[in-house]
Amino acid sequence: MKSKLRVGLVCGGCSLEHEVSLKSAIYIMKYINKRFFEVVVLWISKQGDWYIVENDDMHIDFFVNKENLHKCMPILMFSSGNRCFEYINNILSLDVIFPIIHGALGEDGSLQGLLRLMNLPYVGSDVLGSAICMDKDITKRLLRDSGLSITPFRTFLAHEKKKLKFLNFADMFGLPFFVKPVNQGSSIGVAKVNDDYSFHSALDIAFFYSHKIIIESCIAGRELECAVLGNNENPITSVCGEIIKKNDDFYTYCDKYVDHNSEIVIPAVLEKSVSSKIRSIAIRVFQILNCFGMARVDIFLFGKDRIIINEVNTLPGFTSDSMYLKLWQATGINISTLLTRLIMLALDRYYKYN
């Protein structure tokens, strides 16, 4: 009988989405097909230190208690000032890596570059696709230049902050409009602007998270999402889902992970022609941005059939509340099958291009 594939599940990380990453990893551990895969959990602490965590310890309470660190096997230590490569053979003997670190350094191409240097197959987009989709400015430019509709926006760097005037953007975009850091996920650092005070507060917040921000118009359309699965040449799409907010605000981090202050409708109530158009555009977006493995394409539906691309997430959440998983479940692919497909796609890409 063929031995199981050893999967390195990389979680945690230094980003603001550390806890979400842990929840995703725990959920993956629960549903991955253990007949086919042996999982080795590689946890990156908030300080950037790497540890191997025993599978039995994979629960949130374990990571909250710092006294549990002694139970973990150190692999690569940075916070102490030493760069110690102990137990590195445990990494090199892995068959494939499943990175589930959300946000900065995890889905922006940084971790993907490290894995490429180590010559390891890994789930999800490559360095280029990850970096593109993490930068809202670059994503929008590429989609716009490819003829797709995007939300009107302007980009600014930190040194330009003092020249930014509320009235200029109120005239340009109308009210309200959004201020966003270019490189954060889960709506972190995003603010809706209605007046001069909220504008300057939004600038402070956005520039705290990034040296580059975008200011964009607020689209009063239906908020829809479509999941994509596959490698660049043959992706498939899920049914569409809709996020219906219970208030007039945008879909915040708390809505997604804390308060659940929105209604999710899957499949979204759409005319068949509109649904097909959205799914076709999602595939085109996936290919234009050089995505591999998976992505979630977020769009606005304006009027009957005007589709505007909002954002693309190359490493969506894998928790019980995650839209990506719910979309595939409604399409007929359960999480266990989805995880297996993602791992096989990673191996297929690796052996095809290496």
UniProtKB/Swiss-Prot annotation:
Keyword Manganese on entry: yes
Domain ATP-grasp, residue spans: 140-344
EC number: 6.3.2.4
Stored SUPFAM superfamilies: Glutathione synthetase ATP-binding domain-like (SSF56059), PreATP-grasp domain (SSF52440)
Domain of life: Bacteria
GO BP: cell wall organization; peptidoglycan biosynthetic process; regulation of cell shape
Catalytic activity, as annotated: 2 D-alanine + ATP = D-alanyl-D-alanine + ADP + phosphate + H(+)
Localization: Cytoplasm
Positions of Mg(2+) 1 binding: 298, 311
Pfam assignment, any one: Dala_Dala_lig_C
InterPro entries reported in the protein's UniProt record: ATP-grasp, ATP_grasp_subdomain_1, D-Ala_lig_Van_CS, D_ala_D_ala, Dala_Dala_lig_C, Dala_Dala_lig_N, PreATP-grasp_dom_sf
Free-text remark on how the cofactor is bound: Binds 2 magnesium or manganese ions per subunit.
Keywords associated with the record: ATP-binding, Cell shape, Cell wall biogenesis/degradation, Cytoplasm, Ligase, Magnesium, Manganese, Metal-binding, Nucleotide-binding, Peptidoglycan synthesis
Annotated pathway: Cell wall biogenesis; peptidoglycan biosynthesis
Residues reported to bind Mg(2+) 2: 311, 313
Signal peptide per UniProt: none
Cofactor: Mg(2+); Mn(2+)
Free-text function comment from the UniProt entry: Cell wall formation.
Family: Belongs to the D-alanine--D-alanine ligase family.
Record's protein name: D-alanine--D-alanine ligase
Organism: Blochmanniella floridana
